[in-house]
Amino acid sequence: MPAFEAAVHLGADMVELDLRRTRDGVIVVLHDPTLLRLWGIDRTVGDLDLAQIREIGEGDVRVPTLREVLDQFTIPLMVDFTGDEVVEGALDAVREADATDRSLFVSGHVGALRALRALSPEARIGLTWIERRSPPPSLLCELGAEFWNPYFRLATSARVAAVHDLGIKVSTWTVDEPRHMARVAKAGVDAIVSNRIAQLRRFLSPPESARR
């Protein structure tokens, strides 16, 4: 939760989060696949029930459920998932929180996105992309994608223009260096994912004196 609060405070337009599924089927928010780096516990979230997850950490440094994040923050969310095991639970949480309009589901797993689209004609979808080839237009259209979400080095002007021609927007990740921010902005992307929010905001909205 502190990371989300910091992002909001710094003026982020949207917050990206990663989903995991507990052994008893609850969708929680955690970037890492295991608890090792943050808490020294060499277990995956899927090894544990929610009650066991609740015992890990202290204060605000805990593993929140997706529903808790949705209830606490009204900022738009980029909901990232790596497999179809979280799709149904994530969709349920978003619907229960009345957060469909402010939730963008992104994944590089086409099967998971197809499962999501089958369950939810109204879901907002972004196709994450790490391949050197351009995304097939037929795939973007089949998924009803709102965004193409490539790794920033793949977001060339030509690819961005081709995707825009399909009526689809482009977000790109993870762009932390000013020179890369400048390149993807020049390429015409619609959104930039970054760990350096303050720096990105300064780049996108320089003071008046810097524009002269």
Q: What kind of feature is each model-predicted range?
A:
Residues 1-212:
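Phosphate-group recognition and catalysis centered on beta-loop-alpha active-site segments
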